[in-house]
């Protein structure tokens, strides 16, 4: 099923990647032979974007042809919502530097803005949507064309309904889900099934943003 979304692989091909540190990624890269990861997953925190920029300028040289997948956190160190501060322009300088770095990277970048937004009490839905649009409008005005946005939820029992957090088809390129338990992969697990149905309704491809057996490294089997 193709939706002709930004950076969507053709002919039902699947791109796989790994993270969450350069060391872990390098170990995984060296451990697999025929199917090297095409994507490197990393995190950026809005209050500490400068640190991410400095790190990424070094790490991107290690794998120059890699696709980036970035989880952009809009929370402070205590887990408090920073969407109002973003909307007030407090982090404009940091975000400008962030997008400038991405633009210079040139390779495709998948940006999971406010990933796992549906955790109960994490974000105010209206402010989340406004902040999402603010961030997207900012990088588009800067002429950054190598970003695809990923609306990434963790739709489990007990999380918030996702629909009130949707910024609109114009602002979302991909849907994304984070999965960590085997039961979440069951066809009988309604929250994820409904999320996937929503993706089809909006004609968006789906990315698995994060997934691994809890507390078990890939190299250990």
Show where each model-derived region lies.
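Surface-exposed substrate-engagement region within the catalytic domains
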Residues: 1-37, 41-62, 141-221
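Substrate-binding cleft of extracellular glycoside hydrolase catalytic domains
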Residues: 48-151
